[in-house]
Curated annotation (Swiss-Prot):
Part of the 30S ribosomal subunit. InterPro entries: KH_dom (IPR004087), KH_dom-like_a/b (IPR015946), KH_dom_type_2 (IPR004044), KH_sf_prok-type (IPR009019), Ribosomal_S3_C_sf (IPR036419), Ribosomal_uS3_arc (IPR027488), Ribosomal_uS3_C (IPR001351), Ribosomal_uS3_euk/arc (IPR005703). PANTHER family: 30S/40S RIBOSOMAL PROTEIN S3, SMALL RIBOSOMAL SUBUNIT PROTEIN US3. Binds the lower part of the 30S subunit head. It comes from the Archaea. Belongs to the universal ribosomal protein uS3 family. The lineage of its organism: Archaea, Thermoproteota, Thermoprotei, Thermoproteales, Thermoproteaceae. This is Small ribosomal subunit protein uS3. Keywords: Ribonucleoprotein, Ribosomal protein, RNA-binding, rRNA-binding. It comes from Pyrobaculum calidifontis (strain DSM 21063 / JCM 11548 / VA1). Pfam families: KH_2, Ribosomal_S3_C.
Amino acid sequence: MSTAQRRLPVYKKILEENKKKWMIKEFLEYRLAKYGYIDSEILKTPLGTRIVIYAERPSRIIGRKGAIVKEVSSILANKLGVENPQIDVIDVSKIEAPELFPKVVAYRIANAMARGVRFRRVMFVAVRQLMEAGAKGFEIVVSGKLSTERAKFEKITYGKLYKIGYDAKNRVRRAVVHVLLKPGIYGIEVRITPATLRYSDEYKIKPPTRPEAAAQ
């Protein structure tokens, strides 16, 4: 048996795990979006699968006497094959600088547009909040029928933001949200470089230190 053949089951396992995580996230967003769902983290533990849900309205996601969380846990276990799902719901407003979560920014823009606020005004508000939160870089793109019958897009970019390579895939946060308005469907894409992120090509040069005086 070749080395590639011996490694194949490992790769298959990784692909299956990533596929399952994607399915879980898709289901959670579909089921809980109207209750203020923002994002989620999926962590494997010795006791099963821990799912951390970030939400703007945690009480609505939990439901009366935990009814919604219990329903979601049952579907994850029985239909998606998630091993012993344990769900924690965290209020995103209690996290330091929630504006650095792209889903938070995208949903706020979408909700404001749904209320009739002009898209440019909402984008500039988001830009101010991101700069105040200390983002190293960001990009906000709103696409759809913005001013004419033809679809177009409006984009605001600031700071340092990678779009390709390792940093773009693993360190830059990205979210896409769609909202249905009277003229049609609009897309909001947000990419954020967090304030605490250190790029893989970023380094600091320490200032030279004076050698200690030679012993007399």
